[in-house]
Amino acid sequence: MFTPNLPNVLTVLRIMLVPALVVALLGNTPAGDVLAAVVFALASLTDFVDGYLARARDSVTTFGKLMDPLADKLLIVAALISLVSLHRLAAWIAMVIITRELAVTVLRLGATQAGVVIGASLFGKIKTCLQIAAVLAVIAVHGQPAWVSVLLYVTVLVTVLSGLDYFFGLRRRIQQAQAPGGGG
């Protein structure tokens, strides 16, 4: 299933950066926060680069379609749990985001087993950008000023809406596949 191309290697690298992020955050020091911000930004950058390269080089793989979103979720979930444990993020925000991410992951895996593979949508990409910006803001800015709170609320809203969009899009694809002449 793993195809050793640069986009897939970047996805694996992103997964490997997750423990470094957690260790840096949980050190709970100014230097640890700087390191965590750098690691998180670097890992997030690999998400954009691997997607761009996969499309530009026509090297999109099933591994990439499945593991790229999973790597994103691991990165975000690890950061959220770490920030909640440090009391730098409200637990309800993390729970809403994590619940959405887990639900979409379960739906994605179920769809794949049914032969339906759905890549990331524009809405999902916007959600990912907002989550990255929000997590970076919480890591970098202590005390959560109003603009960080607004960013977090917008992120939660878009996260929920993109989850609903994914669910209804998947349902539509399954219905099309099951319809007579729909390929299912």
Predicted regions and their residues:
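Membrane-embedded alpha-helical segments that form the functional core of polytopic membrane enzymes
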Residues: 17-63, 79-95, 148-160
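Short, conserved structural micro-motifs that define repeat-unit consensus positions
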Residues: 4-25, 72-80
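Cytoplasmic-side transmembrane-helix entry/capping segments in multi-pass membrane proteins
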Residues: 67-71, 95-96, 121-127
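Membrane-interface helix caps of multi-pass small-molecule transporters
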Residues: 52-56, 110, 140
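C-terminal membrane-associated helical module and adjoining short loops/tails
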Residues: 1-7, 12, 17-18, 36-44, ...
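Alpha-helical membrane-protein architecture signal
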Residues: 35-38, 63, 67, 103, ...
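Active-site His/Glu-centered metal-binding helix of metallohydrolases
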Residues: 16, 45-53, 70, 74, ...
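Membrane-helix boundary/interface segments in integral membrane proteins
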Residues: 100-116
